[in-house]
Amino acid sequence: MRFASLGSGSEGNGLVVESGGTRLLLDCGYSVKESEFRLARLGLAPDDLSAILVTHEHDDHVGGVFSFARRHALPVYLSHGTFEAHRETHAQEAIGVRVHLIGADTSFAIEDLQVNPFTVPHDAREPLHFVFADGATRLGVITDTGCSTTHIEKTLSGLDALVLETNHDIDMLWASSYPWSLKERIAGRLGHLDNAASGQIGRAHV
């Protein structure tokens, strides 16, 4: 199994997970053209992908998903809550796209990869993150998450590799010029992991 990031940040997110002949794109927060460019830098074309998975409805994760999927005839896997939340503001985007609704803790296969979605605390409708397995390797991916939970700890046990968000230094956040409401959102239990919390999760599971 291999993985590579298309990018990570408020402007967009995307990650490719590969095993055998299967390549999954996790999130697509970029435009179609930008996503194609970033794939090409990895030596990949859209036709090399098998499907797109979505973590949640925030634009930096889902902004390009349906346009890219429609352009390249790719199925999209996401939770019911994420799908409905996105449709409330982008009602027409999913037309012509094969959508598969998935739920937490219900594993499924996409070709050579087994996918285990799990729920995380984040300020979205029904966010999911994922553990990928191919019979030899288990890879966990956890990005936009406010805090760790017992369920997350259990789900991430026994991994071979972990892609983990390290979003901010808590002291620098509180000292920053961000509006107070944004500071509270980022630091809250439904926000983003600070560097220390991410380090604790990483040390415990890899």
Model-assigned labels for residue ranges:
Residues 1-42, 126-144, 161:
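Conserved beta-strand hairpin/beta-sheet module of binuclear metal-dependent hydrolase folds
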Residues 4-15, 54-65, 69-70, 87, ...:
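Structured catalytic core of nucleotide-sugar glycosyltransferases
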Residues 7, 28-30, 57, 81, ...:
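Active-site metal-binding loops of divalent metal-dependent hydrolases
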Residues 33-78, 160:
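Active-site metal-binding motif and surrounding structural segment of the metallo-beta-lactamase
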Residues 74-83, 165:
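Short internal beta-strands
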Residues 80-129, 133-136:
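Metallo-beta-lactamase
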Residues 150-203:
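Cap/insert and terminal regions of metallo-dependent hydrolase folds
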